[in-house]
């Protein structure tokens, strides 16, 4: 099918330790991810886009069970990772470029 497609993704912008301690960012991030995974259970068509790879590393270290749930959702194509491009680079899709999350491939 060559028809154009569009998708809506859930997204939560989580500043990394902006005006609060890093430990609070880790906790808030875990709660946000857990909520997104719960939404995926409720709504099979729901997709989520995460925009900070350091948050993934924190989940792997601090919340391993949650990290495994994230990996499962990535493998299902329901949880996407994004990274911000360098502000000096021209990105065709704007300031965010979708990247492949390595953990889904392991």
Enumerate the predicted regions with their spans.
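Carbohydrate-active enzymes and regulators
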Residues: 1-106
């Amino acid at each position: 099918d060559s028809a154009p497609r569009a998708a809506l993704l859930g997204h939560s912008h989580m500043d990394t330790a902006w005006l609060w301690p890093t430990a609070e960012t880790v906790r808030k991030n875990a709660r946000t991810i857990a909520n997104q995974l719960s939404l995926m259970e409720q709504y099979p068509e729901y997709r989520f886009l995460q925009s900070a790879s350091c948050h993934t590393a924190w989940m792997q270290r601090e919340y391993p069970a949650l990290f495994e749930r994230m990996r499962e959702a990535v493998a299902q194509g329901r949880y996407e990772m994004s990274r911000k491009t360098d502000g000096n680079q021209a990105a065709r899709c704007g300031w965010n470029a979708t990247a492949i999350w390595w953990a889904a491939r392991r």
